[in-house]
């Protein structure tokens, strides 16, 4: 009976992230998804859209000020017969490794594209990351209530640029001010759009069949004729939906709508809950772990400091891979070889936290962390496993950080180490001096770090330029030659936040010369946590 219950709970789970270019409408669609999941009563509109209500999923001060999602938050809600775990990822111009790592914790992704602009740079980068694990992708063409590009052109661009086949499930009826709704190809019905219903769930009118006279009455002769022609073309020229190809990450079902107008979002949720995979198996260094295994396993993919300034706490986000978490259970923290009892794990509703009752494979739970948990840590019910594929990426931008008040050096170091463990930034301490160098994937991370040091650690810090162009983690199996390398290159060596030896290069030329000069040393662009 317990096994049956475990299976039934796991089969309900759908764990996905939303990926998009900034301003494609990701935070808005997150809101509307939560509205349909009854997780919120009324959707907040992102700041900058003429509203003083801040979006539910943007809860750090800096996010509230700027109207962007800086950290990943996790939201769980029921939808029809499924239980959905939605991981929200940063949607701003620069994003951090946090985003990459979040994508290791999901089983599918919803890609949001601004239908007026098509495929943009950030979407390309995020798709490359999903490709590493052949993640199934559902596509939502957003902002159809504005003037959009030709829908066939959009499908063609996604197929060409992102190397994924498209299978349209819905098709837009008109666009911009003339947007009338979508035709649901699978259900063979028109779903009509009403404006001014963005904050609540609409009672939509549906009309069955493309030749139904009611459709002509509703949208007019010309648009009905245009729709018939377009559908004939699109059904003839595009791919049919194929579940196997979708699960293999080779084909994406495509939906059209407007998140701001709260239209078409339920179609996406229907598709995700119907077709997206239940919790998938994960690789460890020794074997594959399957969701239905009775014993609990999970890995930490993110650490968030001070989610609640009242508590000054840190939460480790853990993806459960197999089995079941129940309050007070004992588990093995594999890296430190210690048995721990977890009685106060939490579940999330973007900043609102509740103590977790039972949680199952696919769920994300939060563990209170007093400095002992790191990104990539594995927890099990006894077995010594380490989940693989949770990466650190070499930063691309560097700054020296220094204090306005030199007496706060201890607090600065503490803050930087905590922020680096959380994945907000990387910290490097050169072997030859007391500098603190901060490395990031995107410029905004620097602003985030200074703002958080001030707000959470009461440290007033500023940046200076530093002669570092790139960094690589270094290692070697040849102890003697590695010692020789360390002696000769000491001025280019630093320790990162986890005390791993790193080569910091003033230029690409310098890095390439060192790689040639020391063939027995491995210079790594990524490091497994």
Curated annotation (Swiss-Prot):
> Where does the source fall among the domains of life?
Bacteria
* Domain tr-type G, chain residue ranges per copy: 11-280
Q: Where does GTP bind?
A: 20-27, 88-92, 142-145
InterPro entries linked: EF-G-like_DII, EFG_III/V, G_TR_CS, P-loop_NTPase, PrfC, RF3_C, RF3_dom_3_sf, RF3_GTP-bd
Q: Does the keyword Cytoplasm apply?
A: yes
What's this protein's function?
A: Increases the formation of ribosomal termination complexes and stimulates activities of RF-1 and RF-2. It binds guanine nucleotides and has strong preference for UGA stop codons. It may interact directly with the ribosome. The stimulation of RF-1 and RF-2 is significantly reduced by GTP and GDP, but not by GMP.
The entry sums up its family as follows:
Belongs to the TRAFAC class translation factor GTPase superfamily. Classic translation factor GTPase family. PrfC subfamily.
Write down what this protein is called: Peptide chain release factor 3
Q: Which organism is it from?
A: Pseudoalteromonas translucida (strain TAC 125)
